[in-house]
Amino acid sequence: TARMINEARKRTDAEGMSRQIQMKLGDVTSIPWPEKSFDLVWGEDAWCYVVDKEKLVQEAYRVLEEGGKIAFTDWIEGSSGLSDSEASRINTFMKFPYMETRKGYEKILKDAGFKIEVSDDLTADFADHISLYIKMLTEQFTFDALKIIGNDMELFGQMGGEMVFMEEMARKGKFGRCRMIAVK
């Protein structure tokens, strides 16, 4: 968003790096840069919000130079699989269009022309990360979270319940994270 670009510019200015970094507002499925512009495309736990993950990866391939790498982590459906109702519950709460699987990401990367170097399932530790999120929400960021949601304690309780559900799904291997690195 324009707001995020402005924030990023402030941060790069503060670090004295504004001359080395150029930013453009764009769409990950239509990246506003020419072919072979980058040596790295990177993402962190955000591609779960993208509807057309195939197009995202194809665009990454397009803007990468030969030998360039794509590296990302993302929230995924775990190897134990989610039922339709479990997937719907997590996707609705998190506002995901859907979650890919690790094997699904491998296929998307290969179909786009990438050679996979790393495909790690990080699900085993994911439940502990969610536990930490819950602890932070209930012990450290309670005031800030309540402020964001208009001090609605009922909604705050519902949010906590959804996070506990996600933790349960992660402990069962149904919901997790992956790390992927591939080369063009």
Per-region residue spans from a language model:
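Short alpha-helix
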Residues: 97-119
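Core SAM-dependent methyltransferase catalytic element
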Residues: 112, 134-139, 174-184
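C-terminal helical/coil "lid" or tail adjacent to the Rossmann-like core of SAM-dependent
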Residues: 123-173
